[in-house]
Amino acid sequence: MAPQTETRAGAGFKAGVKDYRLTYYTPDYIVKDTDILAAFRMTPQPGVPPEECGAAVAAESSTGTWTTVWTDGLTSLDRYKGRCYDIEPVPGEENQYIAYVAYPLDLFEEGSVTNLFTSIVGNVFGFKALRALRLEDLRIPAAYAKTFQGPPHGIQVERDKLNKYGRGLLGCTIKPKLGLSAKNYGRAVYECLRGGLDFTKDDENVNSQPFMRWRDRFLFVAEAIYKAQSETGEIKGHYLNATAGTCEEMLKRAVCAKELGVPIIMHDYLTGGFTANTSLSNYCRDHGLLLHIHRAMHAVIDRQRNHGIHFRVLAKALRMSGGDHLHSGTVVGKLEGEREVTLGFVDLMRDDYIEKDRSRGIYFTQDWVSLPGVMPVASGGIHVWHMPALVEIFGDDACLQFGGGTLGHPWGNAPGAAANRVALEACTQARNEGRDLAREGGDVIRAACKWSPELAAACEVWKEIKFEFETIDKL
């Protein structure tokens, strides 16, 4: 006869489906300095109270599950659980709320963006009670920020390495992005650097394809860098994309770049992953390489207003994982980026202490406790007429990257680079003299055209080019 089993009511624990509000919605909770804080934009399913949704987000991204389990009694849930401590409606939106969740520090592995994201933006985003969920911001406490090494070098060390001060840096993505042979690619790099740019760049999808294997590209680009340096007397660089299918292959490419003596390499941090990115950042720090970060795939994650992760969170994550440059949008070019929102996360990349400012989308005061800053990269559909706005918006600590705005010059690559260099220096000088670039920028560019035929030709080509589309990511 088979043994009989019996579950007795009241013995051990009370089984059943949980009402999350009873455990995880705690409006009286006093936030600790060591808590990781998250602001979620929630859209509940019809009929689901926002308090239940906020509590469910806190539960499913920390210690909770859908039912009571007997092993809850083996630990202290009050110590480890996430808590939804505040909920506020989103102005002007129907059935949308900002839920504030506090997570105790012990839930997360030290120095691991991968673990942080696995918890906070993991399975909870598929929760049925929610129609949509977006992580708008994170507050990284000083105690957790200090477990990360951050960027390999940071803005000031980069300037010292390059011996370039008092102006923004200039870059150019080599086009066409795919199809050039390694030798022709190196030729384009040389022409741009000789013309006056500080950097040129591999496009994000240039890895090691049949038309141009990575080692060939590295060798021809290194030759171009050294030739341009010898002719101009300036330190030059090219973002050699080390992104690869495995971490081992990625690091092999980084080692080759180091042996060639080039100053900077590149990684696609979202497609490559945070574990790979942190490993590459550590290598760059140990071996004196700067690390340029491209954000390919970001719009899949951050462009929808109601669901996903805002780019300011991805930018914070990159600062912790490690990178000296990060693409940040332009405000004025062809790619998405509203001015106040963009300036908000640019400050989160560069500054050491950033005050809460909801007008710029910053939900929490952030203290990076001396973690090195990341230089923003403005790239995408920009040309010489945009230079006054770019200098006014980004200031000096930014890399302004003109791809088509260099290579599309009617006289060739080197004149295109010269036009951008003249425009940058003219705008920087005008700003330093106290002129208002927002109002007088066009006059500054036109005046510079009188002594730079390269700039005059560029201004004529791009005088009618505009990208007039409504931005999606608004406050």
From Swiss-Prot:
EC number(s) stated in the UniProt entry for this protein: 4.1.1.39
**Could you give a single Gene Ontology term from the biological process aspect?**
reductive pentose-phosphate cycle
Q: Choose one Gene Ontology CC annotation of this protein and give it.
A: chloroplast
User: Which cofactor is recorded for it?
Assistant: Mg(2+)
Cell location = Plastid, Chloroplast
* PTM annotation: The disulfide bond which can form in the large chain dimeric partners within the hexadecamer appears to be associated with oxidative stress and protein turnover.
Carrying N6,N6,N6-trimethyllysine, the residues are: 14
Q: What keywords would UniProt list here?
A: Acetylation, Calvin cycle, Carbon dioxide fixation, Chloroplast, Disulfide bond, Lyase, Magnesium, Metal-binding, Methylation, Monooxygenase, Oxidoreductase, Photorespiration, Photosynthesis, Plastid
Q: Which positions bear N6-carboxylysine?
A: 201
Give the Gene Ontology MF terms in alphabetical order.
magnesium ion binding; monooxygenase activity; ribulose-bisphosphate carboxylase activity
Q: Name one Pfam family in it.
A: RuBisCO_large
N-acetylproline sites (modified residues): 3
Excised during maturation, the propeptide residues are 1-2
Its EC top class is lyase
Q: Which reaction does it catalyse?
A: 2 (2R)-3-phosphoglycerate + 2 H(+) = D-ribulose 1,5-bisphosphate + CO2 + H2O; D-ribulose 1,5-bisphosphate + O2 = 2-phosphoglycolate + (2R)-3-phosphoglycerate + 2 H(+)
Keyword tRNA processing among record annotations: no
**Residues binding substrate:** 123, 173, 177, 295, 327, 379
Which residues hold Mg(2+)? 201, 203-204
Superkingdom of origin: Eukaryota
Q: Which residues participate directly in catalysis? A: 175 (proton acceptor), 294 (proton acceptor)
InterPro entries per record: RuBisCO, RuBisCo_large_chain_AS, RuBisCO_lsu_C, RuBisCO_lsu_C_sf, RuBisCO_lsu_fd_N, RuBisCO_lsu_N_sf, RuBisCO_lsuI
Subunit-level organization: Heterohexadecamer of 8 large chains and 8 small chains; disulfide-linked. The disulfide link is formed within the large subunit homodimers.
The miscellaneous remark of the record is: The basic functional RuBisCO is composed of a large chain homodimer in a 'head-to-tail' conformation. In form I RuBisCO this homodimer is arranged in a barrel-like tetramer with the small subunits forming a tetrameric 'cap' on each end of the 'barrel'.
NCBIfam families to which the protein is assigned, alphabetical: PRK04208.1
Give the record's family classification. Belongs to the RuBisCO large chain family. Type I subfamily.
Instruction: Write down what this protein is called.
Output: Ribulose bisphosphate carboxylase large chain
Organism source for this protein? Oedogonium cardiacum (Filamentous green alga)
